[in-house]
Amino acid sequence: HALDPDVILLTNFTTAQPEDLLENRTEGRDWQGLRAVEKKAVFKMPLGLYRSFTPSIDSPLTLLWMAKTLHPERFADVDLKAETKRFYKTVFGAELTDEQVERIYRPAKAAGVGAARAR
């Protein structure tokens, strides 16, 4: 590999999940030996109202998720679930359940299917 990243962030424009890279299950690519894979620093981006890799209304939550995910020791006091619920209540007037918050931060593999087909 020309690059050896410390962290890999997977967008929702792909069906790939962290375990696909960690278990080297992606066709045509060998992820073994990469620093991020060895450290298990492979993460799927959240999926709120839109794919969070691009600027969207969910961008503040994406940045908070990135900070907490990449620097957990510095953001240990941040309750991401509570912040997400507060954000959705303030911005949209919507009260999210724990299950809805979980789906934002652990999007299903199928969430990337439409985007993967569009390429």
What is each of the regions a protein language model found here?
Residues 1-60, 69, 74-76, 81-86, ...:
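Binding-cleft/active-site segments that stabilize strongly anionic ligands or cofactors
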